[in-house]
């Protein structure tokens, strides 16, 4: 908060507290009044717009499917979706964004009062499979599409300098946008595209609005870093004794931020300390996969020496229990 920068971009592994950080920052900027429900009060009073796991909690499936009930994604009453859907009518824009990142055949249908969403899949020849339950990844993409529509409108309104000239006063008190990991299930092409589009939105902001973006994806981080023309970054390290070090880095993030080097260092340290554990094999496999992808090999096992290939491949496959090339560690 004290840094007073337009954009702060943060990378951290899963499980290190990015979502907790978003919550703590929200409480710092706008402490919740006693008895107030999260994101349920008047939108005009908000100082921070945030996307995180807590945002996704506003959407939940109606699991009461007795009597052949149709699966619906319910939306808890809140000021953000009420404004973007009921007052601004952005449902078609949301549907278009969602289809862009998933499939043009997968269509969301809002109820007239915007309290529920159902989904259908177009199979061609005018055949439709109605009322399907989408995957968790598709659900996350849908929720991001809702947030994206709100973010576009927020930036557009605040770019109007004179508050009296804005079409709404709903965002006049807004100071921060906190975005936590909007990349849960995108392939690399769409991941890059989302990062480029988000960077473009951020750069289009001409007001005093400040942005904080956190992610566990090295690719998403690097694309944003480069698109936002960042010049300086900081590496926060935690030591075994509980101490911390914050080191300033300059230049290309690919030189300052090297996930594969961190994996290599972690594995080498475990070997040196004679403390190799099961998860180190998962790290090793992850390192092989990233190297194979960079060198253009279809299978990471092709990197292994011929006399060790079969043995090591079996060992790593057995210990990591995964054939996924994009596994998050």
Report each predicted region and the residues it spans:
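Generic solvent-exposed, charged/amphipathic alpha-helical segments
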Residues: 26, 91-99, 103, 195, ...
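RecA-like P-loop NTPase motor core
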Residues: 203, 222-329
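Switch/communication elements of ASCE P-loop NTPase nucleotide-binding domains
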Residues: 1-7, 16-27, 132-246
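P-loop (Walker A) phosphate-binding loop of NTP-binding proteins
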Residues: 13
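Extended helical coiled-coil dimerization/tether regions that scaffold
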Residues: 69-139, 146-176
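General N-terminal leader/first-domain-start detector
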Residues: 5-6, 16, 42-43, 106-110
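Hydrophobic anchor at the beta1->P-loop junction of P-loop NTPases
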Residues: 10
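ABC ATPase nucleotide-binding domain signature region
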Residues: 23-85
